[in-house]
Amino acid sequence: YGGISIGKEALKRFKEENFPNAVHISGYGNTLFGLCLEIDASPAYDLDYFPLGPRMIVQVVETDNGNVPSSERLSKVVNYEEEGQVVFHRLDESFFIPNMFERDRAVRIPPTSTAIEYGITQDGVRNPSLLENSKQVVKTGLY
């Protein structure tokens, strides 16, 4: 949420108590991959993000055998509504980045009807946050 993960209770407090009249715009991504936007505000205070356009692909892969990047893990995509490690792929003519394993975990979600109306047909991610074993060594925030 603006560069850091946020829990449902904190998000609810931000939207309803701290900043009830503000327009909340949330995004998820990084400088290399680009930005996935929150298309719909969730009544359950989930943060659902979808990549814009076919050149950006998000996968969520199993973490059963750890989170070390490997080509065999790329084929182990979790089912919808299951959590795993986020992997980005950016497929531009000028910027080709396949198989970028992130230090984040998230829930894999199918495109919503609103996302499809905007032409977004790729999977998205829900409630991204740091992988458990990354919390000890990773600084969070905007940098």
Could you say what each language-model-derived stretch is?
Residues 1-143:
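Active-site glycine/GP-rich loop and adjacent strand/helix microenvironment
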